[in-house]
Amino acid sequence: METSPLLQKVDAVTIPVPDLESGLRFYRDALGHELLWRHDGIGQAGLGLPGSDTEIVLTTRQDYEPNWLVASADDAARAVERAGGRVISPPGDIPVGRLAVVADPFGNALVLLDLSRGRYAVDEERQVTGLTG
């Protein structure tokens, strides 16, 4: 029986910043990355990478990276644990779906993210207004 790999793609690379405004001044204004969404309530903003749907996520609260897209964060966390890794932070709800933090047997942290609730919907100013899908 053929199975597909657990990690589907890099969904986002998170970059800790002291505050969103200074992070946006650098990554958006100085480096030219397009603002895709901004969620002040959770202290994050997503920026585009040309030719890719992987995002740069500026964050004031989270320091794990990269974020790996998986079909189910719950199933993926169990699979990593069965394979000899460990769960650092059990699966929990996030605005767009579910997220778990695991470590491989070598101590590398992996953020496992599913988009079971959809992606962010934004207004003309790129502020998050809800979810799509």
Where are the model-predicted features located?
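Hydrophobic pocket/interface hotspot
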Residues: V13, G23, Y27, A76, ...
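Conserved beta-strand edge residues that scaffold enzyme active sites
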Residues: G41-I42, D93-P95, A121
